[in-house]
């Protein structure tokens, strides 16, 4: 991460210099080793008229990760300048929960264009999630997860992971469901690695699953993730069918949002003749989050 304002200014000056001289290959190389959050910061802090050009220099996968880190105003500005092909490429690289977050922040005209260029599967999923109340677990869940059947072998499970795992945001935690999608158990990739290839999933899964409902408060779910040290929390509908997961990243976003609101309320209550909190820096860190195994 970029730690110092001085370093940030040096990067901004270098970017401005290279952009003016149209040394685009060097600009691209400058961004390559950076984290998406740092690139987004540089784009936000730099000259607005340069942002579309600089963004287009990024590799496709990096561009999508940077896009998620940008402020909604910058996202909207870029979308308005995207060709249909460029918009489709960005959407293809986004995880579903990130796409939902973006849609929720955009004006109606931009939302219509996003949904028009999204795949039918993403469009359906976005519309499904947007039906849930804003403060519910359903509104922040990710509908892209990896499920297994209890009569699969460990070898079968690994084949399934290799086949579809690359398209998912997380494959560290796996869920076991019956043919009607009712949640039966949970296990980690570590469990699979330590098992024999011919072991059945039913034999190594943990049937005692901690889950939440789509209607549960999202802050309660975020706190539960922290309490149980989970990487993800399975989310079920009213018929107890598995419909999504809330990851630790989603939980961190919720906790940061709630903390920001709390600080703003505190600041509003302070007398006007005293200093008040103008900016909050939140460091919510989750380390070594693993699912307890039996």
Locate predicted features.
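Cytosolic-side membrane-insertion boundary helix
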Residues: 264-286
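Conserved small/polar residues in nucleotide/adenosyl-binding loops
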Residues: 287-293
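Hydrophobic packing positions in regular secondary-structure scaffolds
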Residues: 1-270
């Amino acid at each position: 991460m970029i730690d110092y304002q001085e370093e940030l200014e040096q990067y901004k000056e270098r970017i401005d210099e290279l952009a003016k001289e149209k040394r685009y290959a060097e600009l691209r190389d400058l961004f390559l080793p950076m984290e998406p959050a740092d690139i987004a910061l540089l784009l936000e802090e730099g000259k607005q008229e340069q942002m579309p050009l600089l963004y287009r220099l990024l590799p496709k996968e990096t561009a999508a990760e940077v896009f998620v880190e940008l402020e909604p105003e910058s996202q909207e500005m870029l979308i308005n300048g995207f060709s249909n092909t460029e918009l489709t490429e960005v959407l293809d690289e986004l995880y579903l929960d990130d796409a939902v977050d973006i849609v929720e922040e955009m004006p109606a005209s931009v939302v219509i264009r996003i949904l028009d260029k999204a795949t039918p599967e993403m469009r359906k999923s976005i519309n499904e999630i947007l039906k849930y109340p804003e403060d519910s677990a359903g509104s922040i869940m990710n509908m892209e997860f990896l499920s297994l059947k209890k009569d699969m072998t460990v070898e079968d499970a690994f084949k399934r992971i290799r086949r579809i795992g690359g398209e998912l945001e997380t494959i560290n935690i796996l869920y076991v469901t019956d043919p009607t999608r009712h949640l039966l158990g949970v296990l980690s990739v570590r469990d699979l690695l330590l098992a024999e290839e011919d072991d059945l999933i039913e034999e190594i899964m943990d049937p005692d699953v901690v889950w939440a409902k789509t209607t549960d408060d999202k802050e309660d779910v975020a706190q539960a993730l922290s309490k149980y040290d989970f990487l993800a929390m399975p989310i079920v509908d009213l018929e107890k069918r598995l419909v999504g997961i809330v990851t630790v990243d989603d939980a961190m976003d919720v906790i940061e949002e709630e903390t920001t609101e709390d600080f703003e309320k505190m600041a509003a209550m302070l007398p006007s003749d005293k200093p008040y909190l103008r900016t909050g820096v939140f460091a919510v860190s989750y380390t070594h989050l693993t699912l307890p195994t039996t």
